């Protein structure tokens, strides 16, 4: 598999060879869906909480007498049937949302995503990407000159200037190869990988 190699200005200079075992796999939609759903589920904090009728603080006084009013009988205002009452089946923070995906499947899912991105022309390799100062304007102008408005940049190491310059750009994410997740790879329109980061990805997914 040949990937497009860009220079510092974002212009195509040549191609770089990439292993077919990572960037030449077939598109496996079911596996990608499983990996993405598992990643999102495992990222949940699981702290949602609702109160049942025992936990809602209401008076235990009977709202009205049992018979003779013409209204439906009622015991207390914390009943789940009432507005402001407790939930019948409340959510509790001890719920487990985690999905298990073994390492082999997770890596295969990442390879399938990277292969599809390469086929669609959304993935490119760049010599390096840096800015002279931690200024959002500098990085924004640089990416705009490359025609990139939504991009995930995978670098071999986090450059402080680049990281600080990207924090205020909503459609730009800078990360290392070990932090490249399936959700981000699918979400961003373009993926830029530095040459050194490409070697790390090959080593990680080999």
Swiss-Prot record:
Family, similarity comment: Belongs to the universal ribosomal protein uL4 family.
Keyword Ribosomal protein assigned: yes
Function noted in UniProt: One of the primary rRNA binding proteins, this protein initially binds near the 5'-end of the 23S rRNA. It is important during the early stages of 50S assembly. It makes multiple contacts with different domains of the 23S rRNA in the assembled 50S subunit and ribosome. Forms part of the polypeptide exit tunnel.
Biased composition (Basic residues): 59-70
InterPro entries to which the protein is assigned, alphabetical: Ribosomal_uL4, Ribosomal_uL4-like, Ribosomal_uL4_dom_sf
Subunit details: Part of the 50S ribosomal subunit.
Segments of this protein annotated with the region Disordered: 43-78
Compositional bias annotation for Basic and acidic residues: 49-58
Record flagged with keyword Ribosomal protein: yes
A UniProt-annotated Pfam family: Ribosomal_L4
Record's keyword terms, sorted: Ribonucleoprotein, Ribosomal protein, RNA-binding, rRNA-binding
Biological source species: Herminiimonas arsenicoxydans
GO molecular function, one term: rRNA binding
Protein name: Large ribosomal subunit protein uL4
């Amino acid at each position: 598999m040949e990937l497009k190699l860009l220079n510092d200005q974002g212009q195509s200079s040549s191609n770089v060879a990439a292993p077919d075992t990572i960037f030449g796999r077939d598109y496996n939609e079911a596996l990608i869906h499983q990996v993405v759903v598992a990643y999102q589920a495992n990222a949940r904090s699981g702290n949602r909480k609702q109160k049942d009728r025992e936990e809602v603080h209401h008076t235990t006084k009977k709202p009205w007498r049992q018979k003779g009013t013409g209204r439906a009988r009622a015991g207390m205002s914390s009943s789940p049937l009432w507005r402001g009452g407790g939930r019948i089946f409340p959510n509790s923070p001890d719920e487990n949302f985690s999905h298990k995906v073994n390492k082999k499947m997770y890596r295969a899912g990442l390879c399938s995503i990277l292969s599809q991105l390469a086929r669609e022309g959304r993935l490119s390799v760049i010599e390096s990407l840096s800015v002279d100062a931690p200024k959002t304007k500098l990085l924004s102008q640089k990416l705009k000159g490359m025609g990139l408005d939504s991009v995930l940049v995978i670098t071999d190491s986090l450059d402080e200037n680049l990281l600080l310059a990207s924090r205020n750009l909503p459609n730009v994410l800078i990360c290392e190869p070990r932090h490249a997740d399936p959700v981000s790879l699918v979400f961003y329109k373009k993926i830029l990988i530095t040459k050194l980061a490409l070697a790390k990805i090959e080593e990680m997914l080999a």
